[in-house]
């Protein structure tokens, strides 16, 4: 008897992009364990696992003020385009920066014209006739912060926001940090440096790399070198300083920062509708 449901198969397909039969087989092999089924599909070559899992259904915008970034959600992009909606979000972002908001709870409580942001949001929501949500907020430490806001189209507000904290002086440093922010927006780095990646995630990636190599029939003697190569590929994908720079593909982000005399100390990335 199957120890999974049709809903499990559907969810696995949505997350991985794999076919129905592949998802069924993965759940069978994993004895119904969803996380193990995802790993099974990764070993078998599913490419979008994890990236699809980050998506949620939402419209809205990203707003930044000072060292603080917020996400405000709406039900439709029609409201997201509304100039009043953007003005409201900017006002909340300014209040959030003053309060150093670092969570949805912090954001809901910040003072907007003498009113908690959540109450101000509900009043604005009633005015425009659509449900709105203060989804999240984050504040980054640092005296120097480069900001990049990406618009998916000219008539829509920013859907991606990045803040990069850095140490460095002068126009060259500012330009380098701004390029780093654009890099984060485009290539979605998750960590600043290799040491920031949690050890359990590294070991999980190592295990998957080894299992994938065996699945492909690689020689046992060559496995250690192949696994390390794949692990380095993983780091290049998720670690900002190790990524090839979008500004100069022949150099890593770290090399370009070193040339500009810049030390990156942290970053935050928000995208509307993603976790």
Curated annotation (Swiss-Prot):
Belongs to the EF-Ts family. Residues 76-79 are annotated as: Involved in Mg(2+) ion dislocation from EF-Tu. Associates with the EF-Tu.GDP complex and induces the exchange of GDP to GTP. It remains bound to the aminoacyl-tRNA.EF-Tu.GTP complex up to the GTP hydrolysis stage on the ribosome. The keyword Translocase does not apply. Keywords: Cytoplasm, Elongation factor, Protein biosynthesis. InterPro entries: EF-Ts_dimer_sf, Transl_elong_EFTs/EF1B, Transl_elong_EFTs/EF1B_dimer, Transl_elong_Ts_CS, UBA-like_sf. It comes from Corynebacterium kroppenstedtii (strain DSM 44385 / JCM 11950 / CIP 105744 / CCUG 35717). It is found in: Cytoplasm. This is Elongation factor Ts. GO terms for cellular component: cytoplasm. GO terms for molecular function: translation elongation factor activity. Pfam families: EF_TS.
